[in-house]
Design a protein with these regions (language model features):
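Active-site-proximal alpha-helical scaffold in enzymes
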Residues: 78-81, 151-175
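Conserved "HGTGT" condensation-loop signature of ketosynthase/thiolase-family condensing enzymes
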Residues: 2-124, 128-149, 179-264
Length: 264
């Protein structure tokens, strides 16, 4: 494929596991009790514990009329993105927002209102779509470039990385990858297959030859599922892998095996 770096080529799974590579040139994150970078670094080096608490970033610079529309999960995602969205060429940098569940609590409330024949709030309805946080960020920060929102089951982070690698291969100088999730409503408790705690993080991704933490990610089909992490949901465990400095992280979910590797 002329003009496409070898590390961005998605190989046929019948021939060999597919693989991508990229550099993480910066990161930021927010969760209750972990508002600062040094808090996250200390958390990653210690025993795995889940973020707990009811706090949310204040977003004091956002006009009150807009700030009232942004729920807790959205505030966390916007705050994490803000600290990474620092490039002078920001309009040329796509954003990939990924959340396994999104604002499912808002959707449940809308369904409850429908079930009781109550009128739906137009604002609540508009904010229930999966790309609502991405759209709010583009409005609040006047970002007019490319953004998209994904959900892909347990391996949502990995699939978002594949999307980001494709954008880099297509010529984007960097890509911002924003991952966020929160607790599930009680009505879904019987279906939860991993822990669920509030968090948001953002990685700034670039080509693998750029300075930063160079990671590779390969995947292959037909892998038996592994037991989920009893403490951290998968998206949070991947961020801990980046911060802790581990050489490898292997995950098997939904008949797919994903292998994270650190280089250099």
């Amino acid at each position: 494929m002329p003009g496409v770096p070898e590390s961005f080529i998605f190989r046929n799974k019948a021939a060999a596991p597919a693989m991508i590579e990229f550099s993480v040139t910066g990161w930021s994150a927010w969760a209750p009790g972990l508002p600062l970078a040094q808090d996250w670094l200390a958390w990653a080096q210690g025993e795995a514990t889940a973020p707990v608490g009811e706090g949310a970033p204040p977003l004091a610079d956002v006009p009150p009329v807009m700030r009232r529309r942004i729920d807790r999960l959205g505030r966390m995602a916007i705050s994490a993105t803000d600290d990474c969205d620092i490039s002078p060429a920001r309009e040329q940098i796509p954003l990939v927002f990924v959340s396994r569940h999104g604002d499912v609590a808002g959707s449940v409330e809308l369904l409850r209102a429908l079930g009781q024949a109550e009128p739906l709030s137009p604002t609540a309805f508009s904010l229930s779509v999966h790309n609502a946080v991405a759209a709010l960020y583009s409005i609040v920060r006047k970002r007019h470039g490319n953004y998209l929102a994904l959900a892909a089951g347990t391996a949502s982070v990995e699939n978002a990385c594949v999307e980001a690698a494709a954008l880099l291969a297509d010529g984007a100088p960097e890509v911002l990858l924003v991952c966020y999730d929160g607790p599930l409503p009680e009505v879904y408790a019987d279906f939860a297959d991993e822990p669920a705690h509030p968090y948001a993080w953002c990685w700034r991704l670039a080509a693998p030859d750029q300075p930063g933490e160079r990671l590779s990610l390969c995947w292959e089909a037909d892998a038996p599922a592994a037991a989920p992490d009893p403490v951290l949901q998968h998206g949070l465990a991947v961020h801990r892998f980046l911060l802790k400095g581990d050489a490898a992280l292997d995950v098997a979910v939904e008949d797919q095996r994903w292998r994270w590797r650190r280089h250099g």
